[in-house]
Swiss-Prot record:
Cross-referenced NCBIfam families: xseA (TIGR00237)
Top-level class of the enzyme under EC nomenclature: hydrolase
The gene coding this protein: xseA
Protein name from the UniProt record: Exodeoxyribonuclease 7 large subunit
Enzyme Commission (EC) number: 3.1.11.6
Coiled-coil segments: none
Amino acid sequence: MTVSELNEQAKALLETHFSFVEVTGEISRLIRHSSGHWYFSLKDEKSVISSAMYKFSNQQVKFEVKDGMQVTIYGKLTIYPPSGSYQLLANKMLPVGIGELELAFNQLKSKLENEGLFDIKFKKPLPKFPKKIAIVTSLTSAAYQDMLKVINSRYKLCEFIAFNTLVQGEMAAANIIQMLQKADKMGFDAIVLARGGGSKEDLWCFNDENLARVIFTLKTPIVSAVGHEIDYCISDFVSDHRSLTPTAAMVDLLPDANTILQSLDIAFDKFESFIDGKFQNSFNILNLINQSLKNQAISQKIEKANLTLENKKANLENLITSKINNLAHKIKEFELVFDRQEQFFKATKNMVQIEKNGKIMPLHELQIGDEISIYSQITKKNAIIKS
């Protein structure tokens, strides 16, 4: 028997009897090879074992592995025939004492925070009266429908464009990045990144490091509205504003039309009171001057003062008239814009968009048997062309 044959037989025997092992220990001498494989030692107080984790396995590890970290490894024992060395081949690795996702979240949060990506000095203010907003979310989600309800009931002077994206799974982060970068180039006043509630695993794509760095570079103010109030994602910290829910994002961004009209009424009343006060103050001053000049019998000064007062009164009346006319004109413009938006919403209420395999299709290009999706402003239906 040759040495090679002996090593191969020993390898087969070892892998047969130890095809699955669960071992807990401390990582030491970790080497990340250029091939993508990891080589390290796993040790406790008394012993150490050489270990390896190939690229296709370590790519599934979500947290950052470091020397000194306590981990549990799932794998098998084997022998590396060229050297005859006995080693542990890891298929899966989990941290000890804390969940894998929680550790990965805390590590990334600390890393980005130390780099300054969460610093308040980089936060862009949200527009007070937005005219054009992008919504990046799944168009089939309940969260999107809830947002539309708030839009239709609260403020109709703003244009909304939705960017359909995955919001869950391995491909979601890359898809979201693509949609955010596309929206950022289109001159929106704000972007809303939204998703409804879900488990930590469901929301994990919003903890992607590449996504966080892209959000930080966006020129457009962005609102992160992911999950429920208790759910925190990395996107919440790096965005310009965090809303508790997708519905809350619409409330945070959109002013209430009724509140705007009430504010205009209040402003007009305050302005009117201010002008009345100015008039009264001027008349009081005039009376004091007249009283003072009576004893001096200099009617010429009184006439001059009266003339000055009349001029000031005329100027003030012209100013008041101008201000009131400007305010009335602005209110009229506001009402006209509001009416046009209302008519637009009514006119397009029953318009639909046809998609086949995610692509917008004209009606004349559809064939019998095609499976299509029909979208309106408030719903979606699936159908099959029969004739």
